[in-house]
C-alpha cells in the first residue's frame, strides 16, 4: 500500500536539498531515517520529518508491517523564488534570491 507526504514552499534551495534526498532514495525507511538523523545539512532534518510524516500516513492507512516500508520515490521540485534587495554603497542595490522547494515522498511495501 502506498503512502505519500508532501511539503511545499519550504525555504531550502532545491539544488542543496537534492543532495540530501539522493542519499536516501530507494532505501528502507529505518535506514533512511538513520542516515538523515546524523547528516549535518539543514535539509536533512526537514526531510527526516517528512519521511516520519509519510510513515505516520502509512500507519493511518493500515499498513500491515511498517518495517517493510521503503522509499519508492522522493523528489524535490523548485518552488517560487522570493526576491529581495540589499542596499549597497553609493546608492546601488543588489538582488537577493531566496529559493523555495517542494518535496514529495512516496513509501511502499516490499
Swiss-Prot record:
Gene for this chain:
rplV
Assembly description: Part of the 50S ribosomal subunit.
Main function: This protein binds specifically to 23S rRNA; its binding is stimulated by other ribosomal proteins, e.g. L4, L17, and L20. It is important during the early stages of 50S assembly. It makes multiple contacts with different domains of the 23S rRNA in the assembled 50S subunit and ribosome.
Which organism does this sequence originate in?
Answer: Syntrophotalea carbinolica (strain DSM 2380 / NBRC 103641 / GraBd1) (Pelobacter carbinolicus)
GO function terms (MF aspect): rRNA binding; structural constituent of ribosome
Taxonomic lineage is: Bacteria, Pseudomonadati, Thermodesulfobacteriota, Desulfuromonadia, Desulfuromonadales
Keyword field: Ribonucleoprotein, Ribosomal protein, RNA-binding, rRNA-binding
Q: List GO BP terms, alphabetically.
A: translation
SUPFAM superfamilies in the cross-refs: Ribosomal protein L22
Q: Which Gene3D superfamilies match?
A: Ribosomal protein L22/L17
Q: Which family does it belong to?
A: Belongs to the universal ribosomal protein uL22 family.
Q: What is this protein called?
A: Large ribosomal subunit protein uL22
CC per GO annotation? cytosolic large ribosomal subunit
Amino acid at each position: 500500500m502506498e503512502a505519500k507526504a508532501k511539503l511545499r514552499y519550504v525555504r531550502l534551495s532545491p539544488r542543496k536539498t537534492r543532495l540530501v534526498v539522493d542519499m536516501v532514495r530507494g532505501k528502507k525507511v529505518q535506514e533512511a531515517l538513520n542516515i538523515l538523523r546524523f547528516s549535518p545539512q539543514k535539509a536533512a532534518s526537514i526531510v527526516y520529518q517528512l519521511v516520519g510524516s509519510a510513515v505516520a500516513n502509512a500507519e493511518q492507512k493500515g499498513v500491515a508491517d511498517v518495517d517493510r516500508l521503503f522509499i519508492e520515490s522522493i523528489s524535490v521540485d523548485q518552488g517560487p523564488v522570493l526576491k529581495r534587495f540589499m542596499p549597497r554603497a553609493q546608492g546601488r542595490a543588489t538582488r537577493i534570491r531566496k529559493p523555495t522547494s517542494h518535496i514529495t515522498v512516496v513509501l511502499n511495501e516490499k
